């Protein structure tokens, strides 16, 4: 659903909040020439495969150049011979039942890395989050009801954690214990840290379950850890526990191959009859692949968020392992889940699908490139909403590449990442944040670019009970207001 409102708060009240996973942003698009971190640049074939997609991704002449990120030297010394290894998987979290939805939405909107109010309105963040979550909860519950009543993200993350531990042991001889820290719902990151402390972990690998780094996903989770580590250096300082962060891993060969293999499986499923149906004078290429990445507003990229470049690089690497256009496969890239009145990264998925239909595309594989497990944005937004739009647009043969979930090659790649991190110079949370411009956002927030309605909170009144809840909400030790079950 496209939302265009002059009032920022009014627009927020219409957000399908169950789909808002991160809000970072983009400016002018240029193909990446070099891979961030370790590794080399993209191959010429990968860059060529993305030419068409890159040409689509323009925000106009007003877009600003991306802020360059200066590399940060890693900490001296590597983690050697740890006695108790822990792996902390960071993820978004999601409501497990309908009763959890409102609390989950509140925590999402109360995060200033997701919704940034202008400085003068920042003290109202908790109240705004309460109003939005209360208003949006019924519709969001309907979305979750359509996929079984709750998010499966925790189930998949637990399965990934368990299998990764097994792979670490079998492939690398490393005994480790995995912990899960969710940003917006149980088990919260703070709970994971308590367990890590109680278990006496002295070497911790921090692995965000987001292949591409964004200030509002991996960055937001790392902020929580950074604040906790700073406040409790007696528990988490270098004298007690070494830690190292894997900030992004979109360019890992095992990850790239895993995604490409799943796409190939879907491409191979088109029958000869469907191939014939998809070939015409209007559309000579019979099979098409649409990478649908989570979109983000432009202002974050202008502040240095590397997410856009990493998406482009990632799609280029995967595309290089797929059949070429001469071999009957054409690649496209779009961005989904935009909300509110500000400019987001283009082209939008709900614009691209009708356009592909007009071009005579009949056979399409949609790839949820930002996600490593099924959740509301794959199971409801893509599988239900976008599928219906595609069929209405004349794309008769629809396929969706599954998320990686517990794919064996992906699990092994997770284990390999952790094992390598234990034997390489460590990268601290602070270094990871600085290297990816976390905390480098301009004081002018996303919302400061929008007109604030003078009619109050989007014209929606709030009663004394709601205001009282805002005042009574307890703050955790990091001065972040969070809502938990029973609040």
Task: Name each region found by the language model.
Residues 28-65:
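N-terminal, immediately post-signal peptide pro-regions of secreted/luminal proteins
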Residues 56-487:
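Active-site-proximal alpha-helix that buttresses catalytic centers in soluble enzyme cores
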Residues 7-8, 22, 36-37, 52, ...:
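Sequence-pattern detector for short linear motifs
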Residues 27-28, 37, 95, 296:
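Alpha-helical hydrophobic packing sites
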Residues 1-36:
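N-terminal chloroplast transit peptides
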């Amino acid at each position: 659903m496209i939302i265009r409102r002059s009032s920022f708060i009014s627009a927020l009240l219409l957000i399908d909040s169950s789909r808002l996973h991160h809000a970072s942003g983009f400016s002018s698009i240029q193909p990446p020439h070099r891979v961030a971190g370790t590794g080399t640049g993209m191959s010429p074939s990968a860059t060529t495969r993305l030419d068409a997609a890159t040409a689509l991704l323009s925000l106009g002449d007003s877009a600003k150049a991306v802020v360059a990120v200066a590399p940060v030297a890693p900490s001296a010394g590597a983690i050697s011979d740890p006695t108790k290894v822990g792996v902390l998987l960071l993820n978004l979290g999601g409501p497990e039942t309908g009763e959890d939805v409102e609390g989950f939405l509140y925590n999402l909107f109360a995060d200033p890395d997701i919704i940034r109010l202008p400085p003068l309105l920042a003290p109202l963040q908790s109240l705004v989050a309460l109003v939005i979550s209360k208003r949006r909860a019924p519709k969001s519950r309907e979305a979750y009801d359509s996929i079984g009543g709750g998010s499966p993200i925790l189930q998949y993350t637990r399965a990934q954690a368990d299998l990764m531990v097994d792979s670490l042991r079998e492939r690398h001889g490393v005994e480790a214990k995995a912990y899960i820290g969710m940003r917006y719902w149980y088990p919260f990151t703070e709970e994971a840290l308590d367990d890590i402390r109680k278990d006496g972990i002295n070497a911790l690998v921090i692995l965000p379950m987001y292949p591409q780094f964004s200030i509002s996903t991996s960055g937001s989770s790392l902020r929580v850890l950074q604040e906790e580590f700073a406040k409790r250096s007696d528990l988490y300082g270098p004298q007690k526990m070494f830690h190292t962060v894997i900030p992004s891993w979109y360019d890992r060969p095992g990850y790239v191959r895993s995604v490409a293999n799943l796409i190939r499986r879907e491409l191979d499923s088109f029958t000869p009859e469907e191939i014939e149906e998809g070939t015409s004078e209007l559309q000579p290429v019979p099979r098409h692949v649409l990478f649908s990445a989570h979109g983000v507003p432009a202002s974050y990229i202008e502040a240095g968020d590397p997410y856009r470049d990493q998406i482009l690089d990632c799609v280029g690497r995967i595309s290089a392992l797929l059949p070429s256009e001469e071999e009957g496969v054409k690649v496209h890239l779009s961005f989904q889940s935009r909300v509110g009145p500000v400019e987001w990264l283009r082209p939008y998925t709900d614009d691209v699908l009708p356009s592909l239909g007009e071009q005579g595309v009949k056979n399409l594989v949609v790839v949820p490139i930002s996600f490593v497990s099924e959740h509301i944005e794959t199971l409801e937004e893509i599988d239900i909403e976008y599928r219906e739009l595609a069929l209405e647009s004349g794309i008769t043969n629809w396929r969706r590449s599954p998320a990686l979930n517990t794919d064996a090659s992906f699990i092994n790649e997770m284990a390999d990442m952790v094992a390598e991190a234990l034997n390489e110079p460590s990268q601290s949370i602070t270094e990871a944040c600085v290297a990816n411009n976390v905390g480098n956002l301009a004081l002018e927030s996303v919302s400061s670019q929008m007109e604030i309605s003078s009619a109050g909170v989007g014209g929606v009144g709030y009663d004394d009970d709601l205001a009282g809840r805002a005042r009574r909400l307890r703050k955790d030790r990091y001065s972040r207001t969070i809502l938990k079950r029973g609040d």
